[in-house]
């Protein structure tokens, strides 16, 4: 069984292993920079670590591969009988990370 971790970033949690490429909420880091992510849980074979003191020593490191945008989300607000309608779109900014280590 492989080693993996659950990391928290941008208000979401992601399951990552070494070598994974994940898209997370935008981080204020440049391309090629190293980043460290807070860990919520670590699974190493049959050993599951959730203790806060033990997790304080664990670090998940990654490298920023670049920045991108998510899919377009269309918002349409409409009120009946008043002629009010509003169309809006949004594309979330994302950061592409490659996980380089769980230590």
UniProtKB/Swiss-Prot annotation:
One of its GO terms (biological process) is translation. Signal peptide: none annotated. SUPFAM superfamilies: L21p-like. It comes from the Bacteria. The keyword Ribonucleoprotein applies. GO terms for cellular component: cytoplasm; plasma membrane; ribonucleoprotein complex; ribosome. It holds the Pfam family Ribosomal_L21p. GO terms for molecular function: rRNA binding; structural constituent of ribosome. InterPro entries: bL21-like, bL21-like_sf, Ribosomal_bL21, Ribosomal_bL21_CS. Keywords: Ribonucleoprotein, Ribosomal protein, RNA-binding, rRNA-binding. Belongs to the bacterial ribosomal protein bL21 family. Part of the 50S ribosomal subunit. Contacts protein L20. This protein binds to 23S rRNA in the presence of protein L20. PANTHER family: 50S RIBOSOMAL PROTEIN L21, LARGE RIBOSOMAL SUBUNIT PROTEIN BL21M. This is Large ribosomal subunit protein bL21. It comes from Mycobacterium tuberculosis (strain ATCC 25618 / H37Rv). The gene is rplU.
